[in-house]
A protein has these predicted regions:
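N-terminal nucleic-acid engagement/recognition segments and initiation subdomains in replication
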Residues: 1-124, 139, 143, 375-376, ...
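Residue-level preference for alpha-helix termini and adjacent loops
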Residues: 40-41, 47-50, 56-57, 62, ...
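Feature primarily recognizes SF3-like P-loop helicase cores of small DNA viruses
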Residues: 80-108, 162, 189-193, 199-234, ...
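P-loop NTPase catalytic core of nucleic-acid-dependent motor ATPases
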Residues: 98-208
Length: 445
């Protein structure tokens, strides 16, 4: 079947329609399909929009319309046209024919937009967040925005691809953070900030047809429990949803990415294992080169060329939808600026900075570093100390085989990676900690 056959005149189409034994036009899907494929008004008019998962009318068909999406009013006009022009009146057959012709005439508006872009060669991704929001123009900010753009492009061309990163813009109210995400979506209908509940059965309807989705309210009220819910939500690659008029639920691969905005600096709950899905960028609107709405047309043109630059990277194939290991390490440290102060980690670090021994255990840290001299640690407190030592403290290496501690018995623990020595040169120490005496050394007795 070919939905884009050359249009014919109405008389030619009528002459080619199947008829009944009595000579009337047959009420068949085939006849309805022939009309939609060849009628001069309807040929090429109906298409399936992959982004919205809906049927669209993509060219004028003789009556005023407010949007491209096929709606009930459009159906009434189409039924009237087919009845008056061809004598076709079976609504179910007409609707089935519309479904077939739309499926054979698919399009994706974001793919079409991105594919038509031509980059002028000027680098903008590196400087965009400084230009509009006053963020630092460093490698981290560049890599953060580039990763987000490539994730959005990948989701458009490869729906459901794995991308669980949220770019989070952090700064005072009125900085233009939400406006940035809205303009980044290119068209306002491709943007949404209406996602309020992640456990809603109809969450797919909130994502449907959108490319850039801002989570502002959820990030503003985030706590440890809700952050875990957001993490789980970001990790999903599809929704399983049954559209009301369909018989069976179907997988709906995600075609969108998520951005976060927060006015509060410490918007991330304390998570010593890392919040790798959240990439925070601090913005300083007073340092911005322009306000993003000062000249909206110019801002949109700038962003359009930034998408063109990102498309060059995407088409080259030389990218990954993840930070490099070095940038991951930087991110983990950087995220601590956006968490509440970790007082227990600070107390343990202060204790270790003054401690002269070469190994410690969790029980020792509980009693001596956290000042619980007369208490016994609970299991969850031991786990917390282990997490701090393994995630937050550097220069100490975990040993899994228990060793003897004079006050705490045999315990697993941590040892200094570079133990302090009495002589300035660690290589001069023997295994037992004594200095080897050579023939040239004079004994002091």
């Amino acid at each position: 079947m070919n939905a884009m056959q050359p249009p014919q005149s109405i008389e030619e189409i009528k002459a080619g329609l199947e008829t009944t034994e009595k000579g009337g036009v047959r009420q068949s899907i085939r006849n309805c399909l022939t009309v939609f494929q060849r009628d001069p008004l309807l040929s090429g008019a109906i298409a399936y929009n992959i982004l919205t998962d809906r049927k669209d009318i993509i060219k004028p068909i003789g009556f005023h319309r407010e949007s491209t999406a096929l709606n009930d009013t459009d159906m009434k006009y189409l039924l009237l046209y087919l009845e008056e022009t061809y004598g076709l009146t079976n609504e179910k057959k007409i609707d089935n024919a519309i479904g077939i012709v739309a499926n054979e005439n698919k399009y994706h508006p974001i793919r079409d937009y991105l594919s038509d872009l031509v980059w002028d060669g000027t680098e903008r991704i590196r400087f965009c967040l400084r230009h509009f929001l006053g963020a630092d123009a460093d490698d981290y900010t560049y890599e953060a925005l580039k990763l987000f753009l490539l994730g959005a492009i990948s989701r458009a061309f490869q729906p459901g691809c794995k991308f669980e990163i949220m770019l989070c813009l952090v700064g005072g109210q009125g900085a233009g953070k939400s406006t940035f995400f809205r303009l980044l979506a290119v068209r306002d209908e491709w943007f949404s900030d209406d996602l309020r509940k992640l456990d809603d059965d109809n969450v797919y309807r909130k994502l449907q047809g959108h490319w850039i989705i801002e989570m502002s309210e959820m990030m503003a009220t985030a706590n440890a429990k809700s952050i875990e819910e957001i993490k789980s939500f970001l990790s999903r690659q599809k929704e399983v949803y049954k559209i009301p008029y369909e018989t069976h639920p179907a997988d709906r691969p995600r075609q969108c990415v998520f951005g976060g905005t927060s006015n509060a600096l410490d918007f991330l709950p304390l998570d010593r294992s890392g919040n790798r899905r959240f990439i925070p960028v601090m913005v300083y609107p007073e340092q911005a080169e322009v306000h993003i709405l000062e000249d909206e047309a110019a801002s949109r043109a700038y962003i359009g060329q930034m998408w063109a630059e990102a498309m060059e990277i995407y088409k080259s194939g030389r990218f990954k939808l993840a930070f490099s290991p070095a940038m991951q390490r930087y991110l983990k440290e950087h995220q601590r600026d956006f968490m509440p102060e970790d007082t227990k980690a600070g107390m343990i670090q202060a204790y270790l900075d003054k401690y002269t021994g070469s190994m410690v255990c969790s029980k020792q840290l509980y009693k001596e570093a956290l000042n619980h001299a007369f208490d016994e640690p609970k299991q969850w407190e031991i786990r917390e100390i282990n997490e701090i030592m393994n995630q937050c403290i550097s220069s100490w290496r975990y040993f899994p085989n228990p060793r003897m501690f004079s006050e705490y018995g045999r315990q697993k623990g941590w040892e200094r990676e570079n133990p302090a020595t009495d002589s300035g040169n660690p290589s001069e120490k023997t295994m037992d900690g004594f200095v080897e005496v050579t023939e040239q050394m004079e004994l002091p007795f």
